[in-house]
């Protein structure tokens, strides 16, 4: 049952109230409408997937959430308050972090230094305060490093913490990017195709980490992903876009059986029966 206070998931977890709400969002680029009159919400503690064919407007929607784009129409609400147009770093300070479809790391820097950049939006000490109040700045530096080290341990990349990112394989680079986002201790984590280009083993690892972030940190997650096995197994609710419009919204089972979604995206022979779903700890995508 879905209420203003939250809902119970298919595996029996309690999801909280609305964290982020997009109301009647329309985004245009010249004469092209990327998003047309879309409304949906993201609730506290859930994994919310956004799916659709290429060009459906999914990444554009994440760009609206994260402040990269300002819609021509509609309203964005965060924690019940209407959000004015904000720059991305201001959105990040609100507690919203993001990874990107294409890896955006500093290749010449170590893993630790890349993860440390995720703390920049949370730092209070500027150049002047560092000069005048050195002790306070040093304490903040120690605290930030401790947070980053914990994230590195959590994602099991401590053995490569001093390795330059340029020397890492693709799958580990994606994990470092996730670590950088988590270093800001976000309330809402936006993941834009976190498993794009990964092999089966790498996808299984990333799926496990996403579930662990949601479970152990209590982080609310909005996820764009093309692998339907991953989406259906990880997500609590799914919103489906096609040509910039919303054509479906509901639980994985509801979306799987939505005829409009099947016609536009899934295909009539796909996902006619749900994959096995055990307890929360084993909500993993199949290897097939």
Model-derived segments and their meaning:
Residues 271-276:
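Conserved small/polar residues in nucleotide/adenosyl-binding loops
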Residues 4-270:
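Glycine-rich phosphate-binding loops of nucleotide-dependent enzymes
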Residues 277-278, 282-288:
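Positively charged, low-complexity/disordered segments
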């Amino acid at each position: 049952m879905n209420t203003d206070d939250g809902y119970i998931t298919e595996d029996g977890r309690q999801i909280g109230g609305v964290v982020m709400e997009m109301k009647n969002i329309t985004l245009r680029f010249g004469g092209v409408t990327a998003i047309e009159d879309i409304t949906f919400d993201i609730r506290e503690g859930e994994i919310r997937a956004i799916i659709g064919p290429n060009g459906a407007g999914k990444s554009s929607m994440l760009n609206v959430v994260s402040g990269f784009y300002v819609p021509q129409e509609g309203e964005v609400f965060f924690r019940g308050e209407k959000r004015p147009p904000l720059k991305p770093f201001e959105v990040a300070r609100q507690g919203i972090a993001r990874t990107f479809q294409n890896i955006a790391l500093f290749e010449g820097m170590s893993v630790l230094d890349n993860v440390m950049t995720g703390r920049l939006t949370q730092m209070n000490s500027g150049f002047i305060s560092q000069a005048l109040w050195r002790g306070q700045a040093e304490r903040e530096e120690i605290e930030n490093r401790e947070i980053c080290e914990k994230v590195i341990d959590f994602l099991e990349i401590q053995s490569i913490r001093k390795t330059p990112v340029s020397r890492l394989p693709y799958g580990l680079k994606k994990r470092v990017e996730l670590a950088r986002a988590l270093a800001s201790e976000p309330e809402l984590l936006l993941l834009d195709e976190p498993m794009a280009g990964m092999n089966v083993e790498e996808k299984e690892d990333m799926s496990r980490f996403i579930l662990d972030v949601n479970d152990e940190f209590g982080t609310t997650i909005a996820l764009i992903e093309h692998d339907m096995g991953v989406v259906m197994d990880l997500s609590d609710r799914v919103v489906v876009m096609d040509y910039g419009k919303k054509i479906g919204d509901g639980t994985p089972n509801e979306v799987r059986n939505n005829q409009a979604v099947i016609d536009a995206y899934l295909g009539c022979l796909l996902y006619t029966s749900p994959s096995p779903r055990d307890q929360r700890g084993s909500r993993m995508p199949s290897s097939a």
